[in-house]
Design a protein with these regions (language model features):
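Single conserved hydrophobic/aromatic residue that forms the stacking wall/gate
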Residues: 1-5, 9-10
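Structured alpha-helical segments in the cores of large, soluble enzyme domains
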Residues: 6-7, 33-48, 76
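Gly-rich Lys/Arg/Thr-decorated short loops/hinges at beta-loop-alpha junctions or inter-strand turns
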Residues: 11-26
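Conserved, mostly hydrophobic/aromatic
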Residues: 55, 111
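Short glycine/threonine-rich loop-to-helix capping motif typified by GTGT followed
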Residues: 63-73, 95-100
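Substrate-binding cleft of secreted/luminal carbohydrate-active enzymes
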Residues: 75-95
Length: 126
């Protein structure tokens, strides 16, 4: 955990974000599963760090497939150790080259209506 021993981290004001990672061979690996979240919670507690854990539903946790964010968000919200989620969302779905208004130029995103629908579904699960 890069937070442990960090001078930049004020112990009660920082939190961890589990985004997944690339292994030594460059393969994207998720870390939003129950075992990974539990292990991270243990590390935070052991080091007397803020226990708030945010789960990134995109990036390596989705294998860079923005449509998997929905499944990841639903799974995250059901985990009692998860304090929050992070979504890649924009006005228009996907990723666009050339500066199309309302569309991400970097990572592909859920569109506005998909995000709204997902947030309403997540609210119903709380």
């Amino acid at each position: 955990c890069s937070l442990v021993g960090s001078e930049m981290c004020i112990r009660d004001r920082c939190h961890g974000v589990l985004r997944g990672f690339s292994d030594s061979s460059g393969v994207m690996r998720p870390n939003n599963d129950g075992a990974s979240v539990g292990e991270f919670a243990r590390i935070l507690k052991e080091n007397k760090l803020n226990k708030f854990i945010m789960i990134d539903c995109s990036h390596a946790n989705s294998g860079k497939n923005y449509l998997r964010q929905t499944e990841n968000a639903i799974n995250a919200i059901k985990n009692p150790l998860c304090g929050g989620i992070m979504l890649e969302s924009y006005l228009k779905e996907g990723r666009c080259e050339g500066g199309v208004f309302g569309c991400s130029r970097t990572d592909a995103c859920l569109g506005w209506s998909q995000t709204e629908e997902l947030l309403l579904e997540l609210h119903g699960l709380l």
